[in-house]
Amino acid sequence: GFALGRHGADWTVVASVFGGNANTGVGSEGVAATARATYAPIREDDRVLHLGLAGSFRDLPRDGQGLSLSSRSEAFLYQRNFVDTGDIRDASGVRRIGLEAAYRDGAFLVQAEYIHTEVERFGGARTVGFQGGYVQASVILNCKGRAYKIAPDYGATYAVFSGVQVAEADRVSRGGIGVFEFGTRFSAIDLDDAGIRGGIERDVRAVDVSAAGDWSEVKVWYGPTGGLGTSS
């Protein structure tokens, strides 16, 4: 496959096309086309407003393998999938559209994303739709905020917030205390539609992370059966 990207001072556009393994045939796993566009109406040293729109389509071969969508706990504390559609064996194509937004003010960052997925099916069967998204916020307690990068140093990852930059004097290996960040997140995914009962999951979690790798978490989830649980 290949990807092409262009950018200006406050905007980016990226498009790509990918296929299967060349040894087994480019179309053996379907051919996918994706695109993403972003715009930052506010882009200052300490303040950024980011807006984005993305879409993709994958054409699936009629080989009987089908398609499945699933999700585990975001903290990966549990091995099993909390929601799972099982195999949709008559899937002929997948369309996705995503909306994204983020706002940074100094050490504070809030971001959100919503994705809607439609699965087309062979034989005139009804198209099924699934959706998911999240909202999260974080604040870095003793360091400046994450930098916003319009263009990548290499590759095609445009318009993203970089990781926390730890000053040399703050590194634990240099006798410092590290850098601390507190964050909270709510996310949800709905894999129920048109007779497919993949389940509905909602997660809430709060995390305190240090640059030294120490972390603590309190997590609440609402599983597909409506049960409530917590972990820490």
Predicted features by range, described:
Residues 1-62:
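Aromatic- and glycine-enriched pocket-lining scaffold segments that form the walls
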Residues 65-232:
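Outer-membrane beta-barrel pore domains
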